[in-house]
């Protein structure tokens, strides 16, 4: 043991050659004895003189710093290293482990860059982050160096402004990030974020120190599947599943009938009563199943309904022996009385009334006097205070051309203005039908209206098919409905005499007031008959009357002079003054109208959504010709892109051509991310392969562009090689590199991203 003094301090030296120490002393005791670090002992081995004037004060400071660094002697670290073989806990405390950790830390410090996120004015740092391996903090792509990171940030994240600083003594490499003023000016940031100068720049990134390689096969995530109930009523539906869809307003379609034979009942029960107004009334009669008067002694009938919309004291005629279907009467007036119904059975008889003081007389089972009852219940219409304007058919100018006036028809007296009778299309109104031909003359005498005088012309309208001006006898098996607008018509008593039929008919012909212009009776084309038909069946019949206080003579059952009666009842038709128009088939027009209505009905049953906002839109917006908001036209964008490139100076035509094709391709295929670029390069090479082969300058600019993409890390060498191989290969072999077919600039394709 030796004693030496260092700067006035006494240090104890322990040597292995000392005779006083035993060889069997434990290592722990030696560790306890060695209380000084290794540098102290090394300094003690060199001879030092405390009186030497050549030593400087700086050497004393270095020795003290070395002593402070090492808190344990070398033997302690050696002992910890040997013990760490059995217990890994001691490994991190050994000297070798600490030295390796420091070297690793120094080697890794070269790839760290600090990002300072500043406000718009670049005056205040809002947030700071340190990334490793020269990685981008936004997309986490390693750029390989300071220069590569600089190129990547400027090209891929152009919404921000970057300022780069090299590493110096006081700090490492840093990057200041701030939002460009143009980003706020052109509305990239929303207005609801408040003042962007006071709001910090927020972004999402992962801590790269915590990323580890994990085996997905061992760590399989178990998903907890939660099944939610789906409300089927909120889903859009079509018309195939017999359901109704509501767009914006609470609109519902009328109920559907399982049989086409019940359509008339559904329509009559769902029609709303329309209040009277001071405006002129414009009645309109549609095509199919138009209201007809009751028919006497009809069997196997379907859906008989009477719809009356009159003013005062209107009575509906009775029905005799109606069987096997619903009979419904719809009354919407005041003080209406219904005459008796005779012997109706086998179905529901329903009466729907929305008026006041409605009374019904008792029913009878007699069916012989039905025609007599009809004659007594026909009211007349009071003259209106204002002229009635009715819809005039566009085909009225063709009627007089096809049918000329007959010699047996009487001439019509002149009137101040022409009165045109207008009749609608199918199954048009006809007078009530009798049980046999013997009663045809009786019905005709009672159903001829008198035309009242008016200052304005009355234009009733009748369209084409199956029109008859005389009654049909013994019809059955179809829908029957009567719509009447008449008031206070008294009918005279009936007689059973048949001798004076011609005299009766002459007295019951409608009296037409004198006028200065002729009256024109207008009837449409198809299947028009001016004579009565016996035993006609399976067609709808309706009567619409607008008469004023006409007395009806008694009826007879004679049928001998029917032809003479009809000859006296037909008025003459005047020639129209309108120009001739070529006849168009009514059936073709009806077919086109029905197809259009069916198409619109199918569209109304669907729910449409906006292509960009994904919000439901109404059917009117779908059918409108206006464009939706923020929608752009590709053709207009192509023209603007071409004009923008034409303004460039110092650029060749081939380069402009290449830039135009690439920009159009990127916009139409929606290449918006860095991961889409490899797929876009391959598909662009396939699309313009032939043009690149024919033009060397085009191929040159394409190669230069790929080199720039490769330098910036947007494509890899594998993608570069694929593009070159596509250009050198035949057209049949070009499609084997990607999963999709050849690209098309106007169609979207599936994308493959380089890993």
Curated annotation (Swiss-Prot):
In this chain, the stretch annotated as 6 X approximate repeat B covers 267-582
Region 10 X approximate repeat A, as annotated, extends over 245-565
The record's B- repeats, renumbered to this chain, cover: 267-283, 374-390, 405-421, 444-460, 505-521, 566-582
Segments of this protein annotated with the region VEFS-box: 590-725
UniProt entry keywords in alphabetical sequence? Developmental protein, Metal-binding, Nucleus, Repeat, Repressor, Transcription, Transcription regulation, Zinc, Zinc-finger
Subcellular localization(s) per the UniProt record: Nucleus
Region (Disordered) location = 1-28, 199-219, 234-263, 276-590
PANTHER family from the entry?
POLYCOMB GROUP PROTEIN, POLYCOMB GROUP PROTEIN FERTILIZATION-INDEPENDENT SEED 2
* Record's protein name: Polycomb group protein FERTILIZATION-INDEPENDENT SEED 2
């Amino acid at each position: 043991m030796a004693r030496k003094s260092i700067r006035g301090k006494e240090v104890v030296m322990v040597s292995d050659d000392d005779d006083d120490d035993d060889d069997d002393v434990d290592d722990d005791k030696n560790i306890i004895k060695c209380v000084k670090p290794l540098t102290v002992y090394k300094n003690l081995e060199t001879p030092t003189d405390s009186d030497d004037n050549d030593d400087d004060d700086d050497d004393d400071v270095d020795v003290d710093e070395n002593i402070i660094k090492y808190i344990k002697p070398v033997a302690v670290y050696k002992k910890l290293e040997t013990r760490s073989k059995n217990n890994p806990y001691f490994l991190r405390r050994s000297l070798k482990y600490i030295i390796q950790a420091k070297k690793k830390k120094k080697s890794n410090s070269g790839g760290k860059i600090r990002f300072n996120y500043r406000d718009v004015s670049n005056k205040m740092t809002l947030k700071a982050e340190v990334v490793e391996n020269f990685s981008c903090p936004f997309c986490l792509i390693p750029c390989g160096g300071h220069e590569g990171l600089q190129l990547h940030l400027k090209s891929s994240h152009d919404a921000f402004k970057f300022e780069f600083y090299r590493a110096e003594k006081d700090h490492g490499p840093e990057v200041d990030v701030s939002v460009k003023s143009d980003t706020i000016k052109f509305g990239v940031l929303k207005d609801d974020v408040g003042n962007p100068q006071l709001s910090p720049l927020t972004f999402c990134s992962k801590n790269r120190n915590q990323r580890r390689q994990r085996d997905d096969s061992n760590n399989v995530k178990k998903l907890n599947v939660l099944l939610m109930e789906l409300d089927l009523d909120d889903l859009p539906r079509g018309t195939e599943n017999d359901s109704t869809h509501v767009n914006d307003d609470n609109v519902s379609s009328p109920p559907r009938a399982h049989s086409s034979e019940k359509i008339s009942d559904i329509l009559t029960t769902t029609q709303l009563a329309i209040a009277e107004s001071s405006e002129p009334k414009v009645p309109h009669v549609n095509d199919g199943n138009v209201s007809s008067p009751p028919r006497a002694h009809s069997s196997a009938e379907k859906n008989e309904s009477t719809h009356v919309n009159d003013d005062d004291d209107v009575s509906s005629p009775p029905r005799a022996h109606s069987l096997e279907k619903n009979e419904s009467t719809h009354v919407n007036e005041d003080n209406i009385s219904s005459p008796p119904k005779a012997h109706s059975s086998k179905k529901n008889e329903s009466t729907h009334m929305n008026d006041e003081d409605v009374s019904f007389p008792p029913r009878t089972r007699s069916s012989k006097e039905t025609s007599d009852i009809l004659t007594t219940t026909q009211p007349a219409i009071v003259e209106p205070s204002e002229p009635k304007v009715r819809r005039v058919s566009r085909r009225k100018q063709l009627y007089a051309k096809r049918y000329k006036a007959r010699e047996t028809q009487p001439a019509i007296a002149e009137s101040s203005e022409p009165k045109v009778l207008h009749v609608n299309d199918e199954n048009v109104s006809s007078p009530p039908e009798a049980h046999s031909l013997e009663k045809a003359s009786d019905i005709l005498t009672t159903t001829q209206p008198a035309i009242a005088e008016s200052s304005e012309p009355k234009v009733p309208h009748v369209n084409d098919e199956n029109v008859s001006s005389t009654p049909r006898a013994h019809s059955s098996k179809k829908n029957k409905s009567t719509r009447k607008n008449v008031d206070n018509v008294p009918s005279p008593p009936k007689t059973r005499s048949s001798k004076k039929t011609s005299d009766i008919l002459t007295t019951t012909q409608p009296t037409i007031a004198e006028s200065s212009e002729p009256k024109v009776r207008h009837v449409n084309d198809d299947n028009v008959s001016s004579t009565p038909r016996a035993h006609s069946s399976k067609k709808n019949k309706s009567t619409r009357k607008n008469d004023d206080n006409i007395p009806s003579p008694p009826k007879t059952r004679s049928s001998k002079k029917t032809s003479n009666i009809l000859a006296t009842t037909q008025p003459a038709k005047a020639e129209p003054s309108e120009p001739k128009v070529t006849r168009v088939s009514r059936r073709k027009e009806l077919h086109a109208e029905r197809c259009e209505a069916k198409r619109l009905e199918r569209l109304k049953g669907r729910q449409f959504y906006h292509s960009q906002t994904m919000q439901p839109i109404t059917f009117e917006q779908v059918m409108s010709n206006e464009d939706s908001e923020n929608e752009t036209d590709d053709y207009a964008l192509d023209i603007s892109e071409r004009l923008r490139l034409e303004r460039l100076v110092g650029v060749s035509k081939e380069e402009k051509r290449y830039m135009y094709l690439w920009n159009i391709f990127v916009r139409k295929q929606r290449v918006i991310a860095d991961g889409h670029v490899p797929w876009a390069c391959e598909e662009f090479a396939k699309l313009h392969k032939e043009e690149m082969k024919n033009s060397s300058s085009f191929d040159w600019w394409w190669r230069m562009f790929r080199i720039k993409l490769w330098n910036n890390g947007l494509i890899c060498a594998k993608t570069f090689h694929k593009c070159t191989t596509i250009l050198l290969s035949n057209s049949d072999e070009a499609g084997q590199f990607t999963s999709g077919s050849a690209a098309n600039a106007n169609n979207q394709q599936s994308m493959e991203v380089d890993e």
